[in-house]
């Protein structure tokens, strides 16, 4: 699996891996890169089956497989310890890694994630799957912003959304891959294991998230010992995009608290 590994700002700088949600694209974190790259070595990637890592996925694709794919790629690049910032599905990958390979994960930032899929989120995905089966990639892509962004934010950016739709359709991961990745997401359940997560953990949610209720993050915090939680009052499911300034402040402050480092003296 191909990774996008940025230069380290100094030798030995902490590594921060950025993992997107169901869309899978590493470009999802564009609004965070400038805020992080002076302090951390950033690693982003397109999830297997998407973008630069396109290709058919196995029938029994699972969250454990997604986590192992990422870990193997990082190890092949010489990265053995890292923090992970994950959004939704990416947060689940982080949870899986922290449980399966705790020695590798220095910290977690879980953005609009969950322990187990809520009935509300399951209903949202059922509606989206029906759209996919009835209208194909175009219907899936055109409906997606409704679950990601607040209405006023979308209304003020229609040309941008139309351009994003066209790009997403042209780079669509494929119906079969999408359904396999979605099935892995729906089957993931960390409710019995989350108490074993030992690394520092920051949980970020948005109060107006339509797809994943903010209450899921409250449940997540209660399940992970010593975890911290910040709830943004606005921003929707993609709050790191719609209110990047607020999100980046939360993210940078959280990482600084969890990954205290001394910059190399020059």
Curated annotation (Swiss-Prot):
Residues 14-238 form the AB hydrolase-1 domain. It comes from the Bacteria. Transmembrane segments: none annotated. GO terms for molecular function: hydrolase activity, acting on carbon-nitrogen (but not peptide) bonds, in linear amides. Pfam families: Abhydrolase_1. It catalyses: carbamate + 2 H(+) = NH4(+) + CO2. Keywords: Hydrolase. It is an enzyme of class 3 (hydrolase). GO terms for biological process: nitrogen utilization; uracil catabolic process. InterPro entries: AB_hydrolase_1, AB_hydrolase_fold, Carboxylesterase_BioH, Pyrimidine_utilisation_RutD. Its EC number is 3.5.1.-. Belongs to the AB hydrolase superfamily. Hydrolase RutD family. PANTHER family: HYDROLASE ALPHA/BETA FOLD FAMILY (PTHR43194), PEROXISOMAL MEMBRANE PROTEIN LPX1 (PTHR43194:SF2). Involved in pyrimidine catabolism. May facilitate the hydrolysis of carbamate, a reaction that can also occur spontaneously. This is Putative carbamate hydrolase RutD. The gene is rutD.
């Amino acid at each position: 699996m191909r990774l996008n590994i940025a230069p380290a700002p100094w030798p030995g700088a902490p590594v921060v891996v950025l993992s997107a949600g169901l869309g899978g694209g590493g470009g999802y974190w564009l609004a965070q890169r400038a805020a992080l790259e002076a302090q951390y070595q950033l690693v982003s990637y397109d999830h297997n089956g998407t973008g630069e890592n396109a290709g058919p996925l196995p029938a029994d694709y699972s969250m454990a497989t997604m986590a192992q794919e990422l870990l193997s790629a990082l190890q092949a690049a010489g990265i053995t310890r890292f923090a992970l910032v994950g959004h939704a599905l990416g947060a689940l990958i982080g949870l899986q890694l922290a449980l399966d390979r705790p020695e590798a994960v220095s910290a977690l930032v879980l953005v609009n994630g969950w322990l187990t899929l809520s009935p509300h989120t399951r209903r949202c995905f059922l509606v989206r799957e029906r759209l996919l089966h009835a209208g194909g990639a175009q219907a899936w892509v055109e409906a997606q912003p409704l679950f990601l962004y607040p209405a006023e934010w979308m209304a003020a950016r229609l040309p941008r959304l139309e351009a994003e739709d066209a790009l997403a359709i042209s780079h669509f991961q494929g119906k079969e891959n999408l359904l396999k990745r979605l099935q892995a997401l729906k089957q993931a359940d960390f409710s019995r294991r989350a108490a074993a997560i030992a690394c520092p953990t920051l949980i970020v949610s948005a109060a107006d998230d339509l797809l994943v209720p903010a209450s899921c993050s409250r449940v997540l915090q209660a399940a992970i010992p010593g975890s911290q939680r910040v709830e943004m009052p606005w921003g929707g499911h993609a709050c790191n995009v719609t209110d990047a300034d607020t999100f980046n402040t939360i993210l940078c402050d959280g990482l600084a608290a969890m990954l205290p480092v001394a910059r190399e003296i020059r």
